[in-house]
Amino acid sequence: MKLCAVIIASLLVCVAVASSSDNQKEFAQEKEMTREETQSLGEHEKDDEVTGSEERSCIEEWKTCENDCECCGMSTLCAASWVDGHQIKLCRNEGGKLKKVLHFIQKSVSKIKSCRK
């Protein structure tokens, strides 16, 4: 019975942590400065000529990135992997926090059921 109580308590903690990390990510995105605010107009026009019509607001999945804020979508993260001794950062869809929380709930329920046997 104590194990079941511990599992339920850990489930509640995980849900609280998942919701607070989503709030932190939204806060970081609100505070991020736009390209126009950080560069002069001349530099911005020069970059447009070099890159053409490339979209800068967000990077699509499986393209290179520097941090999570650059990737499109809430569940997409900038994940690092090593290829031939070099670190490459790519935007990857990690399935989101909700999917991980639901999977944890499913595992917890199955453990609670096994506690009762």
From Swiss-Prot:
Q: Name one GO molecular function term.
A: toxin activity
Main location (coarse class): secreted
Which residues are part of the propeptide segment? 21-56
Q: Which UniProt keywords apply?
A: Disulfide bond, Ion channel impairing toxin, Knottin, Secreted, Signal, Toxin
What compartments host this protein? Secreted
Q: Where is the signal peptide?
A: 1-20
Q: Where is this region: Disordered?
A: 20-55
List where Basic and acidic residues composition bias occurs.
23-55
Please tell me whether the keyword Disulfide bond is annotated for this protein: yes
Q: Does the keyword Transcription regulation apply?
A: no
Q: From the record, give the cysteines joined by S-S bonds.
A: 58-72, 65-78, 69-115, 71-91
Q: Record's superkingdom?
A: Eukaryota
Query: One GO CC annotation, please?
Result: extracellular region
Coiled-coil residues are none
* Tissue note: Expressed by the venom gland.
Q: Which family does it belong to?
A: Belongs to the neurotoxin 03 (Tx2) family. 02 subfamily. HNTX-XV sub-subfamily.
Job of this protein: Putative ion channel inhibitor.
Share the domain note from the entry: The presence of a 'disulfide through disulfide knot' structurally defines this protein as a knottin.
Q: What is this protein called?
A: Hainantoxin-XV-5
Q: Which organism is it from?
A: Cyriopagopus hainanus
